[in-house]
Amino acid sequence: MLNVEMLSTGDEVLHGQIVDTNAAWLADFFFNQGLPLTRRNTVGDDLDALVAILRERSEQADVLIVNGGLGPTSDDLSALAAATAKGEGLILHPEWLENMTRFFAERGRPMAESNRKQAEIPASAEMINNPVGTACGFAIQLNRCLMFFTPGVPSEFKVMVEQEILPRLRQRFTLPEPPVCLRLTTFGRSESELAQNLNPLTLPPGVVMGYRSSMPIIELKLTGPAEQRDAMLALWPEVRKVAGDSLIFEGTEGLPAQIARCLQERQLSLTLSEQFTGGLLALQLSRAGAPLLASEVVPAQEETLAQAARWAAERRINHFAGLALAVSGQENDHLNVALATPDGTFALRVKFSVTRHSLAVRQEVCAMMALNLLRRWLNGQPLASEHGWINVVDSLSM
């Protein structure tokens, strides 16, 4: 198996001033290509430290993806570190300098003299095109390791990995078939409870069951080599059975996207009224392309369950919408969720059984609960369901 590693650079990454989303993306992308990362390192803007780790990893890794440090400023040191590690100088590539000049001219801006630095790469390096930015990438061979140097801007990094680096790896190495990863997401069950019920399952050789908890959901992943695909598919119904009523979607589509697709397929429009969730439902559904006719965020106010139901029903009629979803304000750890449909209006009154979580987490949970209520109606399931540490204390149909 190839030993594939990543090196993230920059003081802001090392000190936690920005989240290293590039590392997470690359790990997931390469895993799905059959190239799981074996190590990740982070080094700040220190030339000696960069040179040292490049030389160290060149004796251990087959492939190293270096990210960041290709900008025009004095703390962008990756090209110099690569040249120093190789014992050679930097050379200016006139074709990339011309490309940068054209890049700025097309945007009506002069190119700063400092940008010339981005056209300088180690003398023996292969230049790698960056079709969406000014920092060219490059590749070098250092000892046993093929190293790729990439810009830190996520949009540039992803394009370079997908369009330039992965094809080179496929040409250079015989890559394994990507692993099989079956996923489902649950809402309202604890990780320990799910694990207790899944542990008795006999997994095929080389197959592992994984859990990813991200409040308010838990993702279950069955991952294994491609040759175990049939055995994994045969086992998957048992995993679904354990998830049971808490299963909200399979794959990676996400609940808002699933709901948006269902609404579009059934030609149903939706209107929203939010108090406690503060527009979170509107944000999630609009990003997913749901057919929203109207959405509002109103100040929290005391209301009974019947009032919440009537409000949702009135919103649906007044906006000529197929559906209306309303979330009330929170009062003494209680709140109401109401869904008005062509078949009638259904409302739940719920109570938080755990209050230690932050406001943001509770808003996320309530938004998910409201989306799940909508999902269950769209799928023809009973609307009332428990939600872990949110207890249903009353319900109403009208």
Predicted features by range, described:
Residues 42, 48-55, 59, 76-172, ...:
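Proline/glycine-rich low-complexity loops and linkers
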Residues 4-6, 147, 270:
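Conserved hydrophobic helix-helix packing surfaces used for dimerization/oligomerization
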Residues 138-140, 211-213, 335-343:
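Short beta-strand elements
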Residues 141-143, 149-216, 223-226, 230-232:
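Accessory alpha-helical/coil subdomains and C-terminal extensions
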Residues 1-41, 292-294:
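Glycine-rich phosphate/diphosphate-binding loop of Rossmann-like nucleotide-binding domains
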Residues 231-398:
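Short alpha-helical segments enriched in small residues
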